[in-house]
From Swiss-Prot:
<keyword id="KW-0758">Storage protein</keyword>
<feature type="region of interest" description="Disordered">
    <location>
        <begin position="195"/>
        <end position="215"/>
    </location>
</feature>
<feature type="signal peptide">
    <location>
        <begin position="1"/>
        <end position="20"/>
    </location>
</feature>
<comment type="similarity">
    <text>Belongs to the 2S seed storage albumins family.</text>
</comment>
<feature type="propeptide">
    <location>
        <begin position="21"/>
        <end position="161"/>
    </location>
</feature>
<keyword id="KW-0732">Signal</keyword>
<feature type="compositionally biased region" description="Polar residues">
    <location>
        <begin position="195"/>
        <end position="208"/>
    </location>
</feature>
<keyword id="KW-0708">Seed storage protein</keyword>
<dbReference type="Pfam" id="PF00234">
    <property type="entry name" value="Tryp_alpha_amyl"/>
</dbReference>
<protein>
    <recommendedName>
        <fullName>2S seed storage protein</fullName>
    </recommendedName>
</protein>
<dbReference type="InterPro" id="IPR016140">
    <property type="entry name" value="Bifunc_inhib/LTP/seed_store"/>
</dbReference>
<dbReference type="GO" id="GO:0045735">
    <property type="term" value="F:nutrient reservoir activity"/>
</dbReference>
<dbReference type="InterPro" id="IPR036312">
    <property type="entry name" value="Bifun_inhib/LTP/seed_sf"/>
</dbReference>
<comment type="function">
    <text>This is a 2S seed storage protein.</text>
</comment>
<keyword id="KW-1015">Disulfide bond</keyword>
<dbReference type="InterPro" id="IPR000617">
    <property type="entry name" value="Napin/2SS/CON"/>
</dbReference>
Amino acid sequence: MAKQIVLALAFAALVAFATAHTTIITTTIEDENPISGQRQVSQRIQGQRLNQCRMFLQQGQNIPREFDNPQMGRQQEQQLQQCCQELQNIEGQCQCEAVKQVFREAQQQVQQQQGRQLVPFRGSQQTQQLKQKAQILPNVCNLQSRRCEIGTITTTVTESNIDIPFRDRPFGTGSQQCRETEIQRPVGECQRFVEQQMQQSPRSTRPYQQRPGQQQQQQRGLQQQCCNELQNVKRECHCEAIQEVARRVMRQPQQQQQQRRGQFGGQEMETARRVIQNLPNQCDLEVQQCTTCTG
């Protein structure tokens, strides 16, 4: 999965400003060859059941080649046969429009499911895969029209960044929804994971207390728990969650500040910066942009 991650963590400025980031993905499908009487055709296929076709389109990622694969899964092969039956039950002049309709429905449903499950949406790549699979249906299903052009697919990404004082901004205030639903989610495991990495920094002044095997096992456990915390946060709030981890690492209770300055030096802080910067990749998050301003 392609990731574009810009994560600038300037620890001295974490208490000053943060960036509220919003990404809006809009997919537009333009019909290049609209048929005459399209409204009548749409009305004719409106009541048709195309569930198997929609399920078939949503299955798998290696779209075009799997039609010729003799080892195609039995379930998917049955879905293809049932999809062909659904399309063949539609009037010949309406079959292409039915393919276009089921493609649009499958594309919309995939986006909705990914939003609910907090799975990063792959954008135009996955939409193109659905399109390729749908365009092969007329030939595979022996429809009256062997060629059915879905249309041009355009994916637009709109981003906005607004700098607001971090001290006035609790965890997750990149949007009203983040503020109301995500502020209660803890990030304590991520904080512990980062601090553990700081303690294991080559120049750390903390005493060595564990065997290497025990350290690695504990590190993997904390990293997994940290990733679980971040993945349980809504996608649009991932940036705020990571910034909250950094803020907590830097802003320990006042009574611990003196002790902390003796424990963590410049090398440890560089380790913390690197660990936090790698969190989106390690936890398979999709953070298009996450910037902490320096002034």
